[in-house]
């Protein structure tokens, strides 16, 4: 059995059960483990409680229980500059961003990794549900987590080969109930702590109220694609393509009582387009354009790829043909897809392996751009 005691692994600890068990497993495997709590957002909940302070207390309790040193590091400036400014800019542009993808790329596997290296880390580890496989030549492949419902490779798709070579995902071969069971058996104080939901810096807050603190809302007209006025919308930034709830219009406005969905946006005229039916024609597209396209392994500057893709988290894979040119790609769907949303990630897979991905710029229906921003 190899001696892991000379290998230092710095674990990103959030105060949740996943990162707690990550640290526990590495400690049990004999690694030299250090726990780091990242404070990325100055956050207070509705009751005036700083949730980061509460989470840090949980990190301290777990680190003490399993016998590892721990530190807290503040990345609020890096987070604001690299993630939150991007988040706001995307909403200003009428898009629907995915800050978790950018947070992993810029904070958890860049700012945090850089800091860990100053502590002498050989690797960093997180509680993500993903796996890494290492070839003899050192090339790292990122694989889906075995818990299909928890697999987080979608959010890790922008990681580079260099970042992956320094990364361990100890939970990738486990299912979530097994992780909780390990925490309970070890008596960890976080064993029954509920999972966090929502965007990291918003937490459980009301999204509309949160966003309006940073971007002024601009109400405008809500229209059907054939020109009927359906009333006022609260501001384009509050709606995403394919959204059903929150429109304030019921089935009585249409002839068939089918539910209403957001089917388009016109940023220049501040119009929100709505239509009836889950598979409304305006929601269906046959291809997309992506930018910031990136692969986890070295690829040619220009190539074509047959693979599968996800266009949102937890979506089943769809067959696609990808034409890559530099950091841009045209992605052609084998079957029409619903509600392809500019700003979201498109992520490519070859079987179990996550190959990388990009950010969706536009969706197309038979060569015509969809009115999604």
Swiss-Prot record:
The keyword RNA-binding applies. InterPro entries: MnmA-like, MnmA-like_C, MnmA-like_central, MnmA-like_central_sf, Rossmann-like_a/b/a_fold. Residues 150-152, 312-313 are annotated as: Interaction with tRNA. One of its GO terms (cellular component) is cytoplasm. It is found in: Cytoplasm. Transmembrane segments: none annotated. GO terms for molecular function: ATP binding; tRNA binding; tRNA-uridine 2-sulfurtransferase activity. Its main location: cytoplasm. It is an enzyme of class 2 (transferase). It catalyses: S-sulfanyl-L-cysteinyl-[protein] + uridine(34) in tRNA + AH2 + ATP = 2-thiouridine(34) in tRNA + L-cysteinyl-[protein] + A + AMP + diphosphate + H(+). Signal peptide: none annotated. GO terms for biological process: tRNA wobble position uridine thiolation. The active site is at 103 (nucleophile), 200 (cysteine persulfide intermediate). Disulfide bonds join 103-200. ATP binds at residues 12-19, 38, 127. The record marks 128, 344 as: Interaction with tRNA. Keywords: ATP-binding, Cytoplasm, Disulfide bond, Nucleotide-binding, RNA-binding, Transferase, tRNA processing, tRNA-binding. Residues 98-100 are annotated as: Interaction with target base in tRNA. Its EC number is 2.8.1.13. HAMAP family: tRNA_thiouridyl_MnmA. Catalyzes the 2-thiolation of uridine at the wobble position (U34) of tRNA, leading to the formation of s(2)U34. Belongs to the MnmA/TRMU family. NCBIfam families: PRK00143.1, trmU. This is tRNA-specific 2-thiouridylase MnmA. It comes from Streptococcus pneumoniae (strain ATCC 700669 / Spain 23F-1).
């Amino acid at each position: 059995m190899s001696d892991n005691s000379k290998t230092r692994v710095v674990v990103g600890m959030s105060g949740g059960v996943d990162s707690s068990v990550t640290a526990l497993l590495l400690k049990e495997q004999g690694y030299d483990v250090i726990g780091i709590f990242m404070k990325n957002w100055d956050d207070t909940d509705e009751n005036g409680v700083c949730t980061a302070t509460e989470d840090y207390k949980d990190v301290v309790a777990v680190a003490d229980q399993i016998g590892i040193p721990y530190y807290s590091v503040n990345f609020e400036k890096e987070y604001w500059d690299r993630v939150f400014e991007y988040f706001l800019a995307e909403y200003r542009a009428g898009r629907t961003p995915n800050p978790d993808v950018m947070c992993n790329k810029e904070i958890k596997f860049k700012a945090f990794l850089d800091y860990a290296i100053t502590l002498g880390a050989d690797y960093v580890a997180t509680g993500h549900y993903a796996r890494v496989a290492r070839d003899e030549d050192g090339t790292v492949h990122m694989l889906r987590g075995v818990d299909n419902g928890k697999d987080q490779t979608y959010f890790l798709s922008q990681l580079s080969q260099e970042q992956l070579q320094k990364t361990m995902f100890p939970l990738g071969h486990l299912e979530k109930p097994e992780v909780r069971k390990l925490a309970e058996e070890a008596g960890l104080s976080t064993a029954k702590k509920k999972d966090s939901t929502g965007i990291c810096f918003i937490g459980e807050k009301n999204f509309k109220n949160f966003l309006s603190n940073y971007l002024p809302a601009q109400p405008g007209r809500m229209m059907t694609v054939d020109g009927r006025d359906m009333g006022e919308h609260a501001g384009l930034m509050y709606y995403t393509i394919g959204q059903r709830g929150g429109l304030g219009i019921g089935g009585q406005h249409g002839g068939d009582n089918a539910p209403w969905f957001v089917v388009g946006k016109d940023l220049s005229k501040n119009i929100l387009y709505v239509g009836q039916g889950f598979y409304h024609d305006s929601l269906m597209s046959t291809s997309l354009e992506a930018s910031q396209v990136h692969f986890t392994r070295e690829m040619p500057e220009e190539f074509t790829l047959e693979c599968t893709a996800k266009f949102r988290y937890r979506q089943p894979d769809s067959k696609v043909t990808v034409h890559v040119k530099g950091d841009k790609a045209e992605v052609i769907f084998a079957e029409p897809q619903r509600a392809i949303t500019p700003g979201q990630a498109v992520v490519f897979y070859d079987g179990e392996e996550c190959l990388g991905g990009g950010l969706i710029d536009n969706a197309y229906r038979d060569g015509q751009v969809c009115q999604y921003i």
